[in-house]
């Protein structure tokens, strides 16, 4: 079943916050990314998490990016990581990939994330998508993949044109291949899950999104929404 998803749909799903609410009610999230020279992507993602309403935001990134993150968003708890790192306890949703290059540092970080077990859901975006093909991704965690058409083509081993010619089938194929929910970005973004027959098409957006960093923001908005409560205690 195909359904339309738009701003009105999203607005209806977000609760008005209780006057008794506190930061612990709105999730603990972490962004992992930002190789040397690409820290802006990870910083944008962590900032978008704040603006989307996450209760607590962590950022694990290359040490060279920590100062810039703290200057721009002191609310974000930024950590510099070298070859390995430890996740804080009880992360609800983890976003891995913004600003990750296809290099050894990034690959080590990716492997640390996939082998960790102290978070709920993992969103794999941008650079992290390079590694799931060569690593035959195996994790029991709930996964969301957020490829643009070029990344989708690499995940499926087909051409960009083939993805664009049948975006619905491409999204479903990725979802089934990796047992993951998928957000296939682009004109009429496709949202689907491997364990649900429903499929959503989002008609919002336009050419104003054709700019570096918008995908990093989208991934953060998406994963932050997963941490927000669907109800409050009476």
Regions found by a protein language model. Name each.
Residues 1-121, 130-144, 153-226, 231:
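Small-residue (G/A/S/T)-rich helix-start motifs and N-terminal tracts that mark the onset
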């Amino acid at each position: 079943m195909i359904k339309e998803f738009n701003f009105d749909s999203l607005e209806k799903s977000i609760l008005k916050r209780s006057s008794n609410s506190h930061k612990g009610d709105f999730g603990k999230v972490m962004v992992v990314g930002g190789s040397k020279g690409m820290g802006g992507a990870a910083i944008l993602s962590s900032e978008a998490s704040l603006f989307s309403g996450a209760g607590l935001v962590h950022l694990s990134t290359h040490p060279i990016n920590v100062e810039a993150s703290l200057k721009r968003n002191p609310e974000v708890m930024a950590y510099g990581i070298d070859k390995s790192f430890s996740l804080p306890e009880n992360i609800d949703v983890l976003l891995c990939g913004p600003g990750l290059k296809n290099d050894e540092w990034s690959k080590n970080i990716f492997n640390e994330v996939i082998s960790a077990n102290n978070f709920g859901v993992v969103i794999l975006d941008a650079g992290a998508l390079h590694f799931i093909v060569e690593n035959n991704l195996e994790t029991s965690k709930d996964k969301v993949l957020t490829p643009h058409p070029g990344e989708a083509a690499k995940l499926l081993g087909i051409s960009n044109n083939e993805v664009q010619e049948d975006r619905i089938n491409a999204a479903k194929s990725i979802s089934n291949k990796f047992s993951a929910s998928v957000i296939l970005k682009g004109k009429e973004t496709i949202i689907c899950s491997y364990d649900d027959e429903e499929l959503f098409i989002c008609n919002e957006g336009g050419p104003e999104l054709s700019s570096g960093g918008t995908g990093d923001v989208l991934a953060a908005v998406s994963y932050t929404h997963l941490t927000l409560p669907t109800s409050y205690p009476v």
